[in-house]
């Protein structure tokens, strides 16, 4: 099957997690013998320096062999109307390049409402599948509300990455199939590294919604535990202040997934104190490493974290986080069983099987207009 994946970006050394969900799916589809072109529409403002215009790349740094067609347009903060028009124009230009160079896709797979709506406004004639990941659906602004409506009216199939997100889409009158994000389980399947003391790893953007300051305060209540934090963001200064008085709080900054996998292999547990998550891929990656996970009841993670692989505590409760850490760290875990469970749920094979079913349904139900 020939698939055009419409994405917001691709991972890079400067932004290793940008577009990572879309990229992982594209790689997995190609590995299952599908023809895949990743059409990237990067509409970030000009302060994110990059070459503007359309260009073709072949992603070979990991031998993935994915063809990437990029269109970089510095849009930034503009009115909803202008945003819609620019994205539709850019999507149309990407589509024209893809079809002229590689032929007509069997299906368009757009990630996020913004890009599914752009495909709709650009009047793509092919079947359209829309996957939603965005936590902002809980409180959408005007632009997102309009994009949801436009994409929902046009998409031949809609996918959500969690049941909670599916319920939010249902509130907009949109029915969706729940398919989780893909985890590179082979990358995270590493032998546990021996280390001194007790180590907990957490990975998140350092903003208030991720609860990292709360987690750091919780660790202060659990003697002998080192918290290794991967990520960066506006709360780094607050965390540096905490770390200055507690050598067991270690800030590692933003790291590529290979380094994250190394850190998880040397840990005893993973913790996420987020206030809201649509899926929580970092929790799934930790499970793939065989780690038990302590998470808050923030949405997506609580759909796959239970007594067999971790613990769920209330959001924003430092004492509950501290107690949860003590319980998770004080219990023996079968790391091999945790990793196997993650592989059976989040590995590329099972997820691609579900995507192929959705693609066939979209193609079958699609009615060409115009």
Task: List PLM regions with ranges.
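Conserved donor-binding/catalytic core segment of Leloir-type glycosyltransferases
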Residues: 4, 192-210, 216-222, 228
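Aromatic "clamp/platform" in nucleotide-sugar-dependent glycosyltransferases that forms part
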Residues: 275
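A short, well-ordered alpha-helix in the C-terminal region of glycosyltransferases
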Residues: 333-348
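Carbohydrate-associated surface elements
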Residues: 164, 182
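Conserved acidic donor-binding segment of nucleotide-sugar-dependent glycosyltransferases
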Residues: 307, 311-318, 326-332
């Amino acid at each position: 099957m020939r698939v055009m994946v419409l994405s917001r970006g691709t991972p890079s050394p400067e932004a290793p997690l940008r577009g990572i969900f879309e990229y992982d799916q594209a790689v997995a589809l190609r590995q299952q013998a599908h023809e895949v072109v990743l059409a990237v529409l990067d509409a970030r403002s000009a302060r994110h320096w990059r070459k503007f215009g359309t260009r073709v790349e072949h992603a070979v740094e990991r031998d993935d062999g994915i063809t990437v067609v990029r269109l970089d347009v510095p849009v930034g903060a503009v009115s909803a109307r202008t945003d819609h028009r620019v994205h539709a124009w850019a999507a149309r230009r990407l589509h024209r390049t893809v079809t002229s160079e590689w032929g007509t896709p069997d299906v368009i797979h757009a990630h996020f409402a913004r890009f599914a709506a752009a495909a709709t406004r650009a009047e793509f004639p092919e079947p359209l599948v829309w996957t939603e990941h965005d936590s902002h659906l809980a409180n959408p602004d005007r632009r997102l509300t309009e994009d949801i409506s436009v994409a929902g009216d046009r998409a031949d199939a809609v996918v959500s990455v969690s049941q909670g997100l599916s319920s939010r889409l249902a509130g907009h009158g949109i029915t969706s199939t729940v398919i989780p994000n893909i985890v590179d389980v082979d990358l995270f399947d590493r032998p546990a590294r021996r280390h001194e003391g007790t180590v907990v790893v957490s990975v998140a953007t350092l903003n208030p919604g991720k609860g990292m300051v709360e987690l750091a305060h919780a660790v202060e209540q659990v003697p002998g535990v080192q918290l290794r934090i991967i990520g960066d963001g506006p709360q780094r200064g607050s965390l540096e202040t905490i770390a200055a008085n507690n050598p067991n709080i270690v800030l590692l900054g933003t790291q590529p997934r290979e380094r994250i996998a190394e850190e998880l292999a040397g840990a005893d547990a993973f913790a996420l104190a987020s206030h809201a998550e649509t899926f929580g891929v970092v929790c799934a990656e930790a499970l793939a490493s065989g780690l038990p996970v302590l998470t808050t009841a923030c949405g997506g993670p609580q759909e796959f974290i239970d007594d067999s692989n971790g613990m769920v505590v209330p959001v924003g409760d430092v004492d509950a986080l501290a107690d949860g850490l003590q319980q998770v760290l004080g219990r023996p875990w079968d790391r091999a069983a945790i990793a196997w469970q993650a592989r059976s749920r989040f590995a590329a094979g099972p997820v691609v099987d579900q995507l192929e079913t959705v693609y066939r349904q979209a193609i079958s139900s699609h009615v060409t207009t115009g």
